[in-house]
Amino acid sequence: SDNIPELLYYPVSRDELEIHLEGGIHPGGRKWVHLSKTITNAANAGAVHHFHPAIIEIDIIQMQAAGNTVFHAGTTVYLTETVDAQFCVQVPYDNTEYTLMLGEWGEEE
C-alpha cells in the first residue's frame, strides 16, 4: 500500500450514483474496479461514458484498515477488487475541482 493516496475517486452516471452509494462499487465486466487519483482524472475518465458524471470519493485509509487491498496500476490509476458502500461518499456538485471540469466540458459541447 505504499504511496497510495488517502482518497481516490470513481466516476458514475448520475442515474447510478445512489446505487453505488448504497451498494458499493463492483468491477462489472472487468476484473478490477479502476479508481482515479484526482477528481479531475475521474471526471475525465467518466466523461468518456457518461454526460457530466457524478464522482464518488473513496476513503482508502478506512478501506485498507478493513483489509481491502489497493494496487497502483498507472500514473493516476489504482485497482481494487470491490469497494464497500461504507467507504463511499459523493463529491458535491459544487466542489471546486468538479465545477472547473464542468466549465471545461461546457466549452467543448
Predicted region positions:
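Conserved NAD+-utilizing ADP-ribose enzyme module
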Residues: 1-109
